[in-house]
């Protein structure tokens, strides 16, 4: 195994991409690798509160990340800077299992599901209502509703939560079902290990003999030709045998670069649904549910303050709440809006930049090309209107967090494929068309001045 300090740096780098910035900076950033004692990696936490929090809430994620990187299952033991012999401290641990990562095990399917991610703990809002309904339909009737189900959206919006919820629901209603959840990165690593050890059949048997396959972050297969080939055949085998496949990504299939067309087309066989950032009401509901689940007593004014300040994603939102609670505990002061502002000052910019809307883009593009606002929604196809409309669609995709269907709606109810076509066309022209480059630059400068 590599040097434990290098290993811990890699683990932290992986986890930083998976959890919110507030959570990472509060709990993990200041941790350090201490030693490797047999099957246990010992990590130093900055204080007793952080040690207990890490042990109860991050052990599973850390162990899973270590396994993804090394192919070995290590227990994780948290200690504090020793004023006493840390050998005397008691921590939760589990024994390392000596097995190949692709080897068949009885506990494999359920072990990778997070017990906190269920339909009961999922907060439904306008940005995720359709994705939630589709996920529930799939869980209630695997391979009969939508197969595959493809969920896409930004980081921390609930895609992984829904995938785990599907897995839990299926197992609860059919305990004998084989449900497998994994990331595409783990699929890739296990495939590489299987080829290296000349045991590809074990790998194939593991993933082609399941009832429900939940694979996260499929965009990471982009550019990995051999892994795409393997997943293509795995997909076909499962689909032909009426087994459910659920896939998540940070973008729709058509926008995943260097993804083979045959895989792209299969992802489009079933239902594609997106998740968008939560609105204010949903953010407050998320904070209330999180506070209740963790046993936090948070005043309404504090939850409103956090919800107004953090509007990017659920992971950042919950991380901010945890940071406020931790800060209150560490300085032994009551949680108030002022304390929340103090706790979050490092992660909330002093002046939030203006959010550009599709209407802003349409107005500025219309002024630039001397066309009316209503022309963007009209059926006109003359070049004097169609080309500025495509530029506005391109900028809407680049400068807003709106989904493809939402952008299409704002342009007269056009189909999302029209938005994709406009984005691809303008992107291609920008590589060689200097006049278009100037137009885009001037429009963006005007948008900055709004």
Curated annotation (Swiss-Prot):
CDD domains: AAA, Bac_DnaA_C
GO molecular function: ATP binding; ATP hydrolysis activity; DNA replication origin binding; lipid binding
SMART domains linked: AAA, Bac_DnaA_C
PANTHER family, alphabetized: CHROMOSOMAL REPLICATION INITIATOR PROTEIN DNAA
Renumbered residue ranges of the record's region Domain I, interacts with DnaA modulators: 1-84
Domain notes: Domain I is involved in oligomerization and binding regulators, domain II is flexibile and of varying length in different bacteria, domain III forms the AAA+ region, while domain IV binds dsDNA.
Chain's role: Plays an essential role in the initiation and regulation of chromosomal replication. ATP-DnaA binds to the origin of replication (oriC) to initiate formation of the DNA replication initiation complex once per cell cycle. Binds the DnaA box (a 9 base pair repeat at the origin) and separates the double-stranded (ds)DNA. Forms a right-handed helical filament on oriC DNA; dsDNA binds to the exterior of the filament while single-stranded (ss)DNA is stabiized in the filament's interior.
Keywords from the named record: ATP-binding, Cytoplasm, DNA replication, DNA-binding, Lipid-binding, Nucleotide-binding
Record-linked NCBIfam families: DnaA, PRK14086.1
Gene Ontology biological process terms from the UniProt entry: DNA replication initiation; regulation of DNA replication
Segments of this protein annotated with the region Domain IV, binds dsDNA: 329-450
Name of the molecule in the record: Chromosomal replication initiator protein DnaA
Keyword field contains Metal-binding: no
UniProt xrefs under SUPFAM superfamilies: P-loop containing nucleoside triphosphate hydrolases, TrpR-like
Oligomeric form and interacting partners: Oligomerizes as a right-handed, spiral filament on DNA at oriC.
Compartment(s) of residence: Cytoplasm
Segments of this protein annotated with the region Domain III, AAA+ region: 112-328
Pfam families: Bac_DnaA (PF00308), Bac_DnaA_C (PF08299), DnaA_N (PF11638)
One Gene Ontology cellular component: plasma membrane
Recorded family membership: Belongs to the DnaA family.
């Amino acid at each position: 195994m590599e040097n434990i300090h290098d290993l811990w740096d890699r683990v932290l780098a992986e986890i930083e991409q998976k959890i919110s910035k507030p959570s990472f900076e509060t709990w993990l950033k200041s941790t350090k690798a201490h030693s490797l004692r047999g099957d246990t990696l010992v990590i130093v936490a900055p204080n007793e509160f952080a040690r207990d929090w890490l042990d109860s809430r991050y052990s599973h994620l850390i162990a899973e990340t270590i396994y993804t990187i090394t192919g070995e299952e290590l227990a994780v033991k948290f200690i504090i800077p020793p004023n006493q012999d840390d050998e005397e401290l008691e921590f939760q641990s589990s024994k390392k299992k000596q097995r190949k990562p692709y080897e068949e095990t009885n506990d494999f399917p359920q072990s990778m599901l997070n017990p906190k991610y269920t339909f009961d703990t999922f907060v439904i809002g306008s940005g995720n209502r359709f994705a939630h309904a589709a996920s529930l339909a799939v869980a209630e009737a695997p391979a009969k509703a939508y197969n595959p189900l493809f969920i896409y959206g930004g980081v921390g919006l609930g895609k992984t939560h829904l995938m785990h919820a599907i897995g839990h629901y299926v197992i609860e209603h059919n305990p004998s079902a084989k449900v497998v959840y994994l990331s595409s990165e783990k699929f890739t690593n296990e495939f590489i290990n299987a080829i290296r050890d000349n045991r590809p059949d074990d790998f194939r048997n593991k993933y082609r003999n399941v009832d429900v396959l939940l694979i996260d972050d499929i965009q990471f297969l982009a550019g990995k030709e051999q892994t795409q080939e393997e997943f293509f055949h795995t997909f076909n085998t499962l689909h032909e045998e009426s087994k459910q496949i659920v896939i998540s990504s940070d973008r729709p299939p058509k926008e995943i670069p260097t993804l083979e067309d045959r895989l792209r087309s299969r992802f489009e066989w079933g239902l594609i649904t997106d998740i968008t950032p939560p609105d204010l009401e949903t953010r407050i509901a998320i904070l209330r549910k999180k506070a209740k689940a963790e046993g936090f007593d948070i005043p309404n004014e504090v939850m409103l303050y956090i919800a107004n300040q953090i509007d990017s994603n659920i992971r950042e939102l919950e991380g901010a709440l945890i940071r406020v609670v931790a800060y209150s505990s560490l300085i032994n002061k009551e949680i108030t809006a002022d304390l929340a502002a103090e706790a979050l000052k490092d992660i909330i910019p002093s002046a939030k930049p203006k959010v550009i809307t599709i209407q802003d883009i349409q107005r500025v593009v219309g002024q630039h090309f001397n066309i009316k606002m209503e022309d963007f929604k009209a059926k006109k196809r003359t070049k004097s209107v169609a080309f500025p409309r495509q530029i506005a669609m391109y900028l809407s995709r680049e400068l807003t967090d709106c989904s493809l269907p939402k952008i299409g709606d704002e342009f007269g109810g056009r189909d999302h494929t029209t938005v994709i076509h406009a984005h691809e066309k303008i992107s291609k022209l920008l590589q060689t068309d200097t006049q278009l480059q100037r137009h885009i630059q001037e429009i963006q400068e005007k948008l900055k001045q709004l």
